[in-house]
Each structure stands twice: as structure tokens, then as C-alpha cells.
Design a protein with these regions (language model features):
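Non-catalytic DNA-recognition/assembly elements of restriction-modification systems
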Residues: 1-53, 74, 170, 174-215
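Sequence-specific dsDNA recognition surfaces
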Residues: 40-59, 64-95, 113, 118-119
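A short, aromatic/hydrophobic, helix- or strand-capping loop or linear motif
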Residues: 56-58, 150-151, 195-196
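A short beta-sheet element
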Residues: 70, 87-144, 149-155, 159-164
């Protein structure tokens, strides 16, 4: 159907937009012989909250309480899919925080679409300076370092808050981060807008399907 085609088209556009932002990040921070950096750690640019699971009896699928994500099972291309809610939220993330899978496989990423409660399979990475896009693409660039925490063979991989805080990074000048954010943030906003349109289109498609099936 044309609705499905539009959904596919938006998804393709979002993939392309993300690749553009990643290429810009690589150009500005990874491939340039940039001497204007200081050696630091992830804790220099972000505040990390480790998830904690509420009691199982507080879960519901009826939209009561806070949106709740247990782990990476709900992850989408950029934003997780709402499934569960909890009336006893413990640890929260806010819109724009990076959501990181902290249990095997460690390193899968999404972004919080809205305020949400995070379970023990996730950590939330919040920019200290309002540079949410810079933090997101920094985390993408750290995937290979995070992969080290995936256990070999039967060992169950995980990463804790101390290890996350201590991940070494090069911290660029704030002016350079601002330059990146000025281009990348509008790209990320466009990804969000396309995602929202796809959510609306999927809702329309799902409401039309039964009618079409029954003729």
C-alpha cells in the first residue's frame, strides 16, 4: 500500500540522515589531526544513570504510570517502542538521553523519545551541557570499545557505571562541539519528525487493516 511505501521511504531517509551525521562526526572528531582536544573520560561530558527494575506487579500495558523500558528488546532504529508502563518508577531518563544496553549485548543504542523509566538492562547517558547529538554520536563512535564488555563464550557480558564513566575519550573544544551540534541537532530533529510521522501512519494502517480484511 502507499502507506507502507511512505513508512519505508521515511525509514530510508532516517537511515541516510543518521549516516550523514555520523560522517560529519568522523570528519570533525575522528579523522582530523585535531590537536585541540584534551584526554578525558565519558564522565566529563555526560551524567550516567543505571537502570533499576521496578517490581513486576507494577507493570501494565494500559498506559498507567510512566513508560518503562526493561532493556534493548524494545529498541527500534532510533527510538524504543512503547510496550510496558510502571506505576512504581525507580530510575528515569529524559527525552534526548542516549539509552545504552548495559547487558549482553552491551553497546546497542537508542535515544529516549520522552521521559521514561529504565530497567536494569539499560543505562541513560545525559549530556552535561545540552549537547545531546554530540553525546549520541560519541556513543556510536565508542561501539568498538563497548564491545569489549561482551563476554567471551558463556560469560554473560555487562558493564557497570564505574566502567562507563571511565571510558576514555578525547574531549574537543566547546566551540567545536557547538559547531557539530548546530548541524547534527537539526538532523536529529528531522529523524524524530519522520519517526513521528511513521508512528501516525502505522496507527492509520493498523486501524484500516481490519476494515479492509472484512471488506
Amino acid at each position: 500500500s502507499s502507506i507502507s511505501e511512505k513508512i519505508r521511504c521515511n525509514a530510508k531517509v532516517n537511515d541516510n540522515l543518521q549516516q550523514q551525521a555520523m560522517a560529519l562526526y568522523a570528519e570533525m572528531f575522528l579523522n582530523s589531526s585535531n590537536n585541540d582536544v584534551t584526554s578525558g573520560t565519558l564522565s566529563d561530558i555526560a551524567v550516567i544513570t543505571m537502570g533499576q527494575s521496578p517490581s513486576g506487579s507494577s507493570y501494565n500495558e494500559d498506559g498507567v504510570g510512566e513508560v518503562f523500558y526493561q532493556g534493548r528488546a524494545e529498541f527500534g532504529f532510533r527510538f524504543p517502542k512503547r510496550r510496558l508502563f510502571t506505576t512504581e518508577p525507580k530510575r528515569m531518563a529524559v527525552a534526548g538521553d542516549v539509552l545504552l544496553s548495559v547487558r549482553a549485548p552491551v553497546g546497542d543504542l537508542n535515544m529516549a523519545y520522552e521521559r521514561c523509566c529504565i530497567g536494569r538492562g539499560l543505562g541513560a547517558i545525559h549530556s552535561k551541557t545540552g549537547h545531546s547529538s554530540f553525546v549520541l554520536y560519541t556513543m556510536f563512535a565508542l561501539r568498538s570499545q563497548l564491545n569489549v564488555f561482551n563476554g567471551e563464550g558463556t560469560v554473560f557480558g555487562s558493564i557497570n557505571r564505574d566502567a562507563l564513566n571511565a571510558i576514555p575519550i578525547d574531549v574537543p573544544l566547546v566551540t567545536k562541539i557547538d559547531q557539530f551540534e548546530a548541524v547534527a541537532h537539526p538532523i536529529d530533529e528531522l529523524i524524530r519528525t519522520n519517526y513521528e510521522e511513521n508512528c501516525r501512519l502505522e496507527a492509520i494502517r493498523n486501524s484500516l487493516l481490519p476494515k479492509l480484511m472484512s471488506g
